[in-house]
């Protein structure tokens, strides 16, 4: 990966921490928790170390977003479970945490000709309408991700389930552009 530097920007993961939650109890006990079921069916709770946000639902399901790596997801979910336990809410031990989406950025460190890339990659896999969006949208089947390619050489990878998916997708793009003589 020497030609590109990959940085994870956001990890979204989900888990089930209990059979059900009383969100009004959590809102009253957790400082900064926000719950307004007329606006949104879940409780929003933010933490700062490591930085993350939770969507907590009455079903016992929790969505965690905002961390920069998968290890931090496990840390903050564990901390949330401990905090719930501390206010008398029993949680599932060792909950299964599923990464739903990883967004990463990368830089190929070169200016790219998006018109040539659009033709070279084939119109069936890309969307490129520069009047509407300055990037080229490239859908890759393996790993199944979407890569936004910008003329600056910057890439945004969305849809990865692991950091390795993001790294592989950047390598796929780099190799394809290189093989077309566009790097």
UniProtKB/Swiss-Prot annotation:
Provide one Gene Ontology biological process annotation: DNA-templated transcription initiation
sequence repeats by residue range = 8-84, 99-177
List UniProt keywords, sorted A-Z.
DNA-binding, Repeat, Transcription, Transcription regulation
According to the UniProt entry, its GO molecular function terms are: DNA binding; DNA-binding transcription factor activity
SUPFAM superfamilies per UniProt: TATA-box binding protein-like
The answer on whether this UniProt entry bears the keyword DNA-binding reads yes
Keyword Chloroplast applies: no
- Name the family the entry cites: Belongs to the TBP family.
Q: Name the PANTHER family for this protein.
A: TATA-BOX BINDING PROTEIN
Q: What is this protein called?
A: TATA-box-binding protein 1
Q: Which gene encodes it?
A: tbp1
